[in-house]
């Protein structure tokens, strides 16, 4: 629970259509947020939202925005909606699940101006099976979601081979040199571990720890690079 004048923390979980945002949020609600004062703001712009019964059982309040994409046509209304949520519920956390065809950069532009909110994390979920084709066919939205994110969480990595995974990482790194990239299958991770990574921790993630070690020399390479300081490296995910 919040203390005194502590601000409401806000977590944005973006991702293209069908990437797995809803599945991830369900996992976080079940394992991390259950029993806490949380508001989920979701935009059902052509997508199936989280089941209301599931949220009720978890004690989560849902504030749905169904009149259009929150990061495009409803920027003004969305800001007002967030202010109303803070005023009415005074939650510990607000989780925003935007439309899959929205730009994360636009959402951040709205959120940073809302009084009483502290931006806690802004992450993008990417389907490991579809990363390459979405990068080719939906560049404006897909690339913005990746380039803006502080953490990129790959879904369905257990369903792709190592070659495909490395291609995905290369695409992400081309667009975003600094984001943390989670490649571990979600079933092998706790919700708390994912939250920690979204907030900046690398503990317990071999892929993040390896990349951090690789880059500490200042060479600028990442775990998709073959050579670091003249040495060939193999990385496991």
Predicted regions and their residues:
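Short, hinge-like loop/turn segments at secondary-structure boundaries
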Residues: 56-59, 112-114, 140-142, 198-202
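Alpha-helical scaffold elements adjacent to nucleotide-binding pockets in ATP/GTP-utilizing enzyme cores
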Residues: 81-84, 106-110, 145-148, 167-174, ...
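Active-site glycine-rich loop that binds ribose-phosphate moieties when present
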Residues: 137-142, 155, 166-168
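C-terminal accessory "lid"/substrate-recognition subdomains
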Residues: 3, 160-237
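Flexible active-site lid/hinge loop adjacent to a nucleotide/diphosphate
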Residues: 132, 136-148
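A short alpha->loop->secondary-structure connector
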Residues: 112-120, 142, 169-178
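Conserved beta-strand/loop subsegment of P-loop NTPase cores
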Residues: 39, 95, 118-126, 146-157, ...
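Nucleotide-state-sensitive switch-loop elements of NTP-binding domains
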Residues: 5-14, 19-135
């Amino acid at each position: 629970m919040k203390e005194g004048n502590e601000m409401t923390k806000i977590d944005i979980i973006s991702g293209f259509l069908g990437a797995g945002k809803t599945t991830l949020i369900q996992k976080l609600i079940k394992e991390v947020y259950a029993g806490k004062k949380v508001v989920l703001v979701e935009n059902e712009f052509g997508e199936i939202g989280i089941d209301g019964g599931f949220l009720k059982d978890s004690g989560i309040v849902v504030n749905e925005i169904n009149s259009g994409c929150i990061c495009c046509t409803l920027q003004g209304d969305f800001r007002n909606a967030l202010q109303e949520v803070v005023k009415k519920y005074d939650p510990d956390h607000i989780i925003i699940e935007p439309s899959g065809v929205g730009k994360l950069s636009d959402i951040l532009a709205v959120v940073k101006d809302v009084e009483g909110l502290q931006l806690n994390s802004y992450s993008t979920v990417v389907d490991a099976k579809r990363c390459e084709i979405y990068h080719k066919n939906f560049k404006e939205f897909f690339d913005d979601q990746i380039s803006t994110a502080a953490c990129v969480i790959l879904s369905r990595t257990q369903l792709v081979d190592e070659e495909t995974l490395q291609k995905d990482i290369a695409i992400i790194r081309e667009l975003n040199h600094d984001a943390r990239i989670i490649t571990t299958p979600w079933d092998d991770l706790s919700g708390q571990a994912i939250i920690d990574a979204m907030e900046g921790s690398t503990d317990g993630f071999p892929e993040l720890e390896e990349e951090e070690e690789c880059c500490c020399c200042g060479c600028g390479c990442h775990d998709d690079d073959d050579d670091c300081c003249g040495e060939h490296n193999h990385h496991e995910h």
